Amino acid sequence: MSEVEFSHEYWMRHAMTLAKRAWDEREVPVGAVLVHNNRVIGEGWNRPIGRHDPTAHAEIMALRQGGLVMQNYRLIDATLYVTLEPCVMCAGAMIHSRIGRVVFGARDAKTGAAGSLMDVLHHPGMNHRVEITEGILADECAALLSDFFRMRRQEIKAQKKAQSSTD
């Protein structure tokens, strides 16, 4: 029986499921899954608020798991699927871990370090280059984030309204 090769879309849907776990924990809904030889070796979702850890981004969580599974910090030939373009911190971790590719959904104009704001992954001064595939399920990934922030703004507005009515 031959091994099934899963598509970028398949793995991005898995990352979106993880992003929804972040939403359920009231974290910014970003999910990441790390794949090596068609097998999940790490996964994560944003958890900086709950963990009181500014580095607990989805990508970092997945890379940490991958290192433990592979018993090596070098994750050569691994592919990281993430619902949002990585930030500078996460892009740096990808370079240090030596992953081969990052596949992301939505671009991040404010903090994206894989081409939107800057391109850390292809910077000529870096000792490793990470291939980039972007736009996989981009609209769905962006909609999840937009819906989350819309909900948060509505909650804040309702809290302010409730507070002003008690004053």
Swiss-Prot record:
Enzyme class: hydrolase
Signal peptide bounds: none
Coiled-coil boundaries: none
EC number of this enzyme: 3.5.4.33
Residue ranges annotated for the CMP/dCMP-type deaminase domain, each copy included: 6-117
GO molecular function: tRNA-specific adenosine-34 deaminase activity; zinc ion binding
Keywords for this protein: Hydrolase, Metal-binding, tRNA processing, Zinc
Entry-linked Pfam families: MafB19-deam
UniProt catalytic activity: adenosine(34) in tRNA + H2O + H(+) = inosine(34) in tRNA + NH4(+)
Sites where the protein binds Zn(2+): 57, 87, 90
InterPro entries noted in UniProt: APOBEC/CMP_deaminase_Zn-bd, CMP_dCMP_dom, Cytidine_deaminase-like, tRNA_aden_deaminase
Paired cysteines (S-S): none
Single Gene Ontology BP annotation: tRNA wobble adenosine to inosine editing
Names of the cofactor(s): Zn(2+)
Active site: 59
Cofactor note: Binds 1 zinc ion per subunit.
PROSITE patterns in the record: CYT_DCMP_DEAMINASES_1, CYT_DCMP_DEAMINASES_2
Family: Belongs to the cytidine and deoxycytidylate deaminase family.
Subunit architecture: Homodimer.
Function: Catalyzes the deamination of adenosine to inosine at the wobble position 34 of tRNA(Arg2).
HAMAP family named among the record's database cross-references: tRNA_aden_deaminase
Protein's recorded name: tRNA-specific adenosine deaminase
Organism: Escherichia coli O6:H1 (strain CFT073 / ATCC 700928 / UPEC)
Lineage of producing organism: Bacteria, Pseudomonadati, Pseudomonadota, Gammaproteobacteria, Enterobacterales
